[in-house]
Amino acid sequence: MSTRWAIRADRAFDGRGFVRGGLTVVVETDRIVGVEPGMCVLPPDVPLTEVDGTLLPGLVDCHVHLVAAGTFPGSPGSLEWAGAAGASALDDVITTNLRAQVAAGVTTVRDLGDVDFRVLGHRGRKGEGLPRVVAAGPPLTIPAGHCHYLGGVVDPDEPGSLERAVAERVERGVDVVKVMASGGFLTPGSDQLGAQFELAPLRRLVDLVHAAGLRIVAHTHSVPGAEVAVAAGADGLEHFTCLAQGGAAAPTELLERVAAAGMTVDPTLGNDPSRFPPVSDMPPHILEMLARLGITDRDEHFARAARNTLRLREHGIRVVSGLDAGANPAKPHGLLWKSVAELVRGGWPVDEAVATATSAAADDCGVEAGRLEAGHLADLLVVDGDLSTDVTALGRPSAVWLGGVEVMSARPHPG
């Protein structure tokens, strides 16, 4: 008896583009072994599942914080809270967040900031129907720098500090390394408009990480932070907000350098506006920073950020999607589709936007997923509606397969 099975949909996205007439995808164990035109004839011993909606690869969220549930600093569930939470509490939060991700069609997450390397122990939970995890451990930052409370502090002026930090990550078995090249909104006192590292120590850190066979991505909210990360040879830029006094926009020369270096940018777009607190309830340091930046209309700021990503596309820069899930109240886990929708709102074609959360994202995370292609992992997603004409369909998952095993279904089954 054949161990193969197939799934057929009249509408499909293969990871790079929409396929006219749909596809039939043949699966054996955890891999795709064949991809055929929609109405192909299958051997009689290959069971077929026919689905409505749009079939596509499972989504890949390139920027999550599994130890946090998305609240402001100091509140239970925040990144700052996670820095002092016990192991059991962290494990519960991580598991809850992984469940939220897979329920939203996300089959791989890249965690870019935990506590005590706690997330690494949650890799390999596919048997429980939970997403694959690519993990960085605690992000590297300077004393009192952004997210210092997560435990990844290094002192660039202390001999051996960078070497010890990289050696620990290699010993722990991280999949990627993250460094905070600028300050951030979530850490009072950090410099969101400057650079946290001088070029020489950051270049030394990048060289150490590369010598260990790992990639390094840099948190960059400011123009100076992005400039030093590019000059140091980092592999990717997270946020790339390019904040400066009076606004946020990437200088053309910086975009040209990012493109020439072949770097990947994750703009971490997307949020749930209904979860934003009233401005009067926001922490004072965030209100102060918004005033320094001249941001008076939150909605217009986000719309401008979406439009700004067109400049990345125009310069040929590789873009991937990650929500920064768990970082604040408006970024709960399982909302990656909003990142893709923001690209479309900014002017991206739907197929290119969806690719940032499938094939491009999988490549950047180093996983053999993100494509409906023979040899790739059978991480599959069905969404309700025609994704090619309605990007919000990405937020309506009806079935999810992880490594060929159905782990979520909201669709009716025969009998």
What does each of the following model-derived ranges do?
Residues 1-43, 54-55, 385-390, 405-406:
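N-terminal metal-binding scaffold of metallo-dependent hydrolase/deaminase domains
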Residues 288-293, 302-386:
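His/Asp/Glu-enriched, well-ordered alpha-helical/loop segment
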Residues 78-92, 147-164, 215-217:
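Active-site mouth loops of central-metabolism enzymes
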Residues 54-125, 229-232:
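Metal-associated gating/positioning segment near the N- to mid-region
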Residues 10, 349, 354-359, 374-415:
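C-terminal cap of metal-dependent C-N hydrolases
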Residues 188-303, 320, 325-327, 347, ...:
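Active-site core of metal-dependent hydrolases
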Residues 147-203, 235-238:
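Active-site gating/metal-coordination segments in enzymes
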